[in-house]
Protein backbone atom coordinates (compact mmCIF):
# COMPACT_ATOMS: atom_id res chain seq x y z
CA UNK A 1 0.00 0.00 0.00
CA UNK A 2 1.10 3.54 -0.61
CA UNK A 3 1.82 5.53 2.51
CA UNK A 4 -0.10 8.73 3.20
CA UNK A 5 3.05 10.61 2.24
CA UNK A 6 3.18 8.86 -1.15
CA UNK A 7 -0.50 9.55 -1.74
CA UNK A 8 0.06 13.27 -1.09
CA UNK A 9 2.88 13.22 -3.59
CA UNK A 10 0.66 11.95 -6.36
CA UNK A 11 0.15 14.97 -8.60
CA UNK A 12 -2.82 13.53 -10.42
CA UNK A 13 -4.20 10.04 -10.75
CA UNK A 14 -2.03 8.91 -13.62
CA UNK A 15 1.28 10.57 -12.79
CA UNK A 16 3.83 9.51 -10.24
CA UNK A 17 5.58 12.44 -8.55
CA UNK A 18 7.36 10.95 -5.55
CA UNK A 19 10.21 12.46 -3.66
CA UNK A 20 13.29 10.26 -3.71
CA UNK A 21 13.51 8.16 -0.54
CA UNK A 22 16.58 9.81 1.04
CA UNK A 23 17.39 13.34 2.17
CA UNK A 24 19.96 14.85 -0.18
CA UNK A 25 23.48 15.00 1.23
CA UNK A 26 24.36 18.04 -0.91
CA UNK A 27 21.11 19.98 -0.39
CA UNK A 28 19.24 19.81 2.92
CA UNK A 29 15.90 20.69 1.30
CA UNK A 30 16.27 18.14 -1.51
CA UNK A 31 15.93 14.40 -1.86
CA UNK A 32 18.03 11.74 -3.56
CA UNK A 33 17.70 8.14 -4.66
CA UNK A 34 21.32 7.59 -3.62
CA UNK A 35 24.43 9.65 -2.90
CA UNK A 36 26.26 10.68 -6.08
CA UNK A 37 29.23 12.30 -4.35
CA UNK A 38 32.66 10.71 -4.74
CA UNK A 39 31.30 7.63 -6.48
CA UNK A 40 32.81 5.78 -9.42
CA UNK A 41 30.64 5.20 -12.52
CA UNK A 42 30.37 1.53 -11.51
CA UNK A 43 29.14 2.43 -8.01
CA UNK A 44 26.65 4.92 -9.42
CA UNK A 45 25.28 2.31 -11.84
CA UNK A 46 25.04 -0.26 -9.04
CA UNK A 47 23.17 2.16 -6.77
CA UNK A 48 20.94 3.26 -9.65
CA UNK A 49 19.82 -0.34 -10.16
CA UNK A 50 18.66 -0.45 -6.52
CA UNK A 51 16.79 2.84 -7.06
CA UNK A 52 15.29 1.43 -10.26
CA UNK A 53 13.87 -1.50 -8.29
CA UNK A 54 12.31 0.91 -5.79
CA UNK A 55 10.71 2.97 -8.55
CA UNK A 56 9.43 -0.16 -10.31
CA UNK A 57 7.86 -1.29 -7.05
CA UNK A 58 6.17 2.10 -6.63
CA UNK A 59 4.86 2.03 -10.21
CA UNK A 60 3.47 -1.46 -9.65
CA UNK A 61 1.82 -0.36 -6.38
CA UNK A 62 0.19 2.59 -8.14
CA UNK A 63 -1.02 0.38 -10.98
CA UNK A 64 -2.62 -2.02 -8.53
CA UNK A 65 -4.06 0.58 -6.15
CA UNK A 66 -5.70 2.65 -8.90
CA UNK A 67 -6.40 -0.22 -11.31
CA UNK A 68 -4.26 1.34 -14.03
CA UNK A 69 -2.46 -0.09 -17.01
CA UNK A 70 1.16 0.89 -17.52
CA UNK A 71 0.13 2.98 -20.53
CA UNK A 72 -1.98 5.13 -18.17
CA UNK A 73 1.12 6.17 -16.26
CA UNK A 74 3.52 9.04 -16.87
CA UNK A 75 6.72 9.05 -14.83
CA UNK A 76 9.02 11.98 -14.42
CA UNK A 77 11.81 13.39 -12.41
CA UNK A 78 14.16 16.27 -11.82
CA UNK A 79 17.95 15.88 -11.85
CA UNK A 80 18.74 12.47 -10.34
CA UNK A 81 15.01 11.70 -10.53
CA UNK A 82 15.20 12.21 -14.29
CA UNK A 83 18.15 9.83 -14.45
CA UNK A 84 16.27 7.11 -12.58
CA UNK A 85 13.01 7.54 -14.53
CA UNK A 86 14.86 7.32 -17.86
CA UNK A 87 16.65 4.15 -16.79
CA UNK A 88 13.54 2.59 -15.29
CA UNK A 89 11.06 3.65 -17.94
CA UNK A 90 12.78 2.18 -20.96
CA UNK A 91 13.64 -1.07 -19.19
CA UNK A 92 10.07 -1.91 -18.10
CA UNK A 93 8.34 -4.80 -19.84
CA UNK A 94 5.00 -3.02 -19.53
CA UNK A 95 5.53 0.30 -21.28
CA UNK A 96 4.59 3.44 -19.37
CA UNK A 97 2.92 6.15 -21.43
CA UNK A 98 5.64 8.77 -21.11
CA UNK A 99 8.78 9.90 -19.36
CA UNK A 100 9.10 13.58 -18.50
CA UNK A 101 12.62 14.51 -17.47
CA UNK A 102 14.05 17.76 -16.18
CA UNK A 103 17.77 18.56 -15.91
CA UNK A 104 19.02 14.99 -15.90
CA UNK A 105 21.24 12.67 -17.87
CA UNK A 106 21.61 9.03 -18.78
CA UNK A 107 23.54 7.21 -16.06
CA UNK A 108 25.17 4.66 -18.40
CA UNK A 109 24.52 4.59 -22.13
CA UNK A 110 26.33 1.24 -22.31
CA UNK A 111 24.02 -0.33 -19.72
CA UNK A 112 20.91 1.26 -21.17
CA UNK A 113 21.64 0.27 -24.77
CA UNK A 114 21.90 -3.38 -23.68
CA UNK A 115 18.63 -3.25 -21.73
CA UNK A 116 16.11 -1.42 -23.92
CA UNK A 117 12.76 -3.13 -23.53
CA UNK A 118 10.08 -0.52 -24.16
CA UNK A 119 9.55 2.70 -26.06
CA UNK A 120 7.58 5.25 -24.06
CA UNK A 121 7.17 8.82 -25.24
CA UNK A 122 10.03 10.95 -23.91
CA UNK A 123 10.31 14.68 -23.33
CA UNK A 124 13.48 16.08 -21.79
CA UNK A 125 13.88 19.67 -20.64
CA UNK A 126 16.96 21.50 -19.44
CA UNK A 127 18.16 24.97 -18.57
CA UNK A 128 20.91 26.39 -20.76
CA UNK A 129 22.76 27.75 -17.70
CA UNK A 130 22.60 24.54 -15.63
CA UNK A 131 25.96 24.08 -13.89
CA UNK A 132 24.91 21.06 -11.81
CA UNK A 133 23.96 18.85 -14.76
CA UNK A 134 25.39 20.58 -17.85
CA UNK A 135 23.20 21.12 -20.93
CA UNK A 136 25.47 18.69 -22.83
CA UNK A 137 23.74 15.91 -20.89
CA UNK A 138 20.47 16.73 -22.68
CA UNK A 139 22.23 16.72 -26.05
CA UNK A 140 23.89 13.37 -25.28
CA UNK A 141 20.54 11.85 -24.24
CA UNK A 142 18.88 13.19 -27.39
CA UNK A 143 21.63 11.62 -29.50
CA UNK A 144 21.39 8.30 -27.63
CA UNK A 145 17.63 8.04 -28.02
CA UNK A 146 17.83 9.13 -31.66
CA UNK A 147 20.39 6.41 -32.44
CA UNK A 148 18.08 3.90 -30.75
CA UNK A 149 15.07 4.94 -32.85
CA UNK A 150 13.15 6.77 -30.15
CA UNK A 151 11.03 9.76 -30.90
CA UNK A 152 12.09 12.29 -28.32
CA UNK A 153 11.08 15.86 -27.67
CA UNK A 154 13.48 18.28 -26.04
CA UNK A 155 13.14 21.80 -24.72
CA UNK A 156 15.97 24.09 -23.67
CA UNK A 157 15.06 26.98 -21.39
CA UNK A 158 17.00 30.19 -21.92
CA UNK A 159 18.64 31.85 -18.91
CA UNK A 160 17.67 28.90 -16.70
CA UNK A 161 19.92 27.23 -14.14
CA UNK A 162 19.35 23.90 -12.34
CA UNK A 163 15.63 24.17 -11.67
CA UNK A 164 12.22 23.59 -13.24
CA UNK A 165 10.88 26.86 -14.64
CA UNK A 166 7.13 27.53 -14.71
CA UNK A 167 7.03 26.86 -18.45
CA UNK A 168 8.64 23.47 -17.82
CA UNK A 169 5.97 22.54 -15.29
CA UNK A 170 3.29 23.40 -17.83
CA UNK A 171 4.92 21.36 -20.60
CA UNK A 172 5.34 18.34 -18.33
Regions found by a protein language model. Name each.
Residues 94-106:
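A conserved short beta-strand
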Residues 1-8, 12:
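Single conserved hydrophobic/aromatic residue that forms the stacking wall/gate
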Amino acid sequence: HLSDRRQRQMCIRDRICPDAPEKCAASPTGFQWFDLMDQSPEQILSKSLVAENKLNKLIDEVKEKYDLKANDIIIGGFSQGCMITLQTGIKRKDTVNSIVGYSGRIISTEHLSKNIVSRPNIILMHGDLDQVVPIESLLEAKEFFGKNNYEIETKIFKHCEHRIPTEGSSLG
